[in-house]
């Protein structure tokens, strides 16, 4: 095996490209978008994510362009502190958490991928593939064909590679909540060393520092599977939700329509079948997209990427390598996914025990991957 083809240029796909290239493989990455992402909210990088970022070689860049916090503080709607927990659960030598804009993280990964020699193809959406005993050929939307030894689908929750491999359309499970997210600029020195969460009933609002004067806000509220919030109503809807939280006055008065509000429904995909067939493998959200409750989506995708490269390097036979990858990754990723969705379910129904599940997840994450 010499040449690897990756579908998807998000966090998982770029991480896989870097890992495989460092392992000595020739790598081509196909991304459907015509250029690297220019928008997006923030992303939280807990300690296990920082550990894999270090292994990937991008830890220093992420910390340089991110904002580190040590505490997670939870408040009621009046702004009264309910409790705080340390974000350090794995390694005292690492920051508790690094928060970074998704666009910035993509830029960092793109820079490192290009530096190690990944061939990046923009505007190339993989829509099908054909296999022989010797190779796999991906068909792009524009008609171009690309041949490789392995095709890795890191093409997200709506993965074409996954659905072609499984020969069915994978159903997305609605988790009962919608999420609104937006970037915000605030006065200097607003933030120090903590991420904030505000709760009232079934509404949760997170305020995540990206700098001492800037951050991103996410709002979680119940919604039906057929609900959608149009772009032109999102700003006013979010402002109305925040107005019920006196403790969030410092956010509400600085909201600006210059920064668009992103909306999506919380959905998950849990692939119960093997993640590989023949010369095709999936990873990241294509295999285990889940709730953002524990901020583990990106971390799990990067772990997938590193393990895939290790197993392909360790085994000359592709079937043995892909099976070893699946056996290492599926139990851990699906366990974290299940815990994340169960936390959403309990909070949605007002049931106790969500905090205990967070501790259970941390215990899983302390184990090697």
From Swiss-Prot:
Binding site for FAD: 12, 31-32, 126, 285
Entry's Gene Ontology molecular function annotations: FAD binding; monooxygenase activity
EC number(s) from the headed UniProt entry: 1.14.-.-
Broad EC category: oxidoreductase
Stretch forming the signal peptide: 1-32
Alphabetized SUPFAM superfamilies for the sequence: FAD/NAD(P)-binding domain (SSF51905)
Stated induction or repression of this protein's expression: Repressed by YetL. Induced by several flavonoids.
Pfam family, any one: FAD_binding_3
Keyword tags: FAD, Flavoprotein, Monooxygenase, Oxidoreductase, Signal
Transmembrane portions of the chain: none
Cofactor dependency: FAD
Name of protein: Putative FAD-dependent monooxygenase YetM
Organism of provenance: Bacillus subtilis (strain 168)
The encoding gene: yetM
């Amino acid at each position: 095996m010499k040449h690897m083809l990756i579908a998807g240029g998000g966090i998982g796909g770029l991480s896989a490209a870097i890992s495989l290239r460092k392992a000595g493989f020739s790598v081509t990455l196909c991304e459907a978008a015509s250029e690297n992402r220019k928008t997006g909210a923030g992303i939280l990088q807990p300690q296990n994510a920082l550990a894999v970022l270090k292994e990937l070689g991008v830890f220093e860049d992420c910390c340089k362009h991110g904002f580190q916090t040590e505490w997670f503080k939870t408040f009621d709607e009046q702004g009264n502190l309910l409790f705080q927990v340390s974000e350090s659960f794995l390694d005292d030598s690492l920051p508790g958490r690094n928060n970074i804009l998704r666009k910035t993280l993509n830029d960092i990964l793109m820079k490192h991928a290009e530096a190690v020699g990944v061939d990046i193809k923009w505007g190339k959406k993989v829509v099908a593939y054909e296999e022989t005993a010797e190779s796999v050929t991906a068909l792009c939307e524009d008609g171009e064909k690309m041949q490789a030894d392995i095709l890795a689908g890191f093409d997200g929750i709506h993965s074409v590679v996954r659905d072609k491999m499984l020969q069915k359309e994978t159903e997305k499970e609605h988790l009962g909540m919608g999420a609104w997210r937006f970037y915000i600029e605030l006065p200097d020195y607003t933030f120090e060393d903590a991420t904030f969460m505000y709760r009232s009933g079934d509404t949760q609002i997170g305020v995540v520092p990206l700098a001492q004067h800037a951050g991103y806000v996410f709002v979680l509220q119940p919604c039906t599977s057929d609900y959608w919030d149009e772009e032109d109503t999102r700003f006013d809807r979010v402002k109305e939700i925040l107005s019920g939280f006196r403790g969030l006055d410092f956010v509400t008065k600085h909201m600006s329509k210059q920064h668009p509000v992103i909306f999506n429904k919380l959905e998950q995909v849990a692939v119960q079948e093997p993640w590989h067939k023949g010369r095709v493998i999936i990873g990241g959200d294509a295999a285990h997209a889940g709730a953002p409750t524990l901020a583990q989506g990106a971390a799990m995708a990067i772990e997938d990427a590193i393990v895939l490269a290790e197993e392909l390097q360790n085994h000359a036979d592709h079937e043995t390598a892909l099976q070893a990858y699946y056996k290492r990754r599926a139990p851990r990723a699906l366990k974290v996914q299940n815990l994340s969705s169960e936390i959403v379910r309990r909070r949605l129904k007002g049931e106790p025990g969500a905090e205990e599940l967070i501790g259970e997840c941390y215990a899983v994450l302390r184990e090697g991957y």
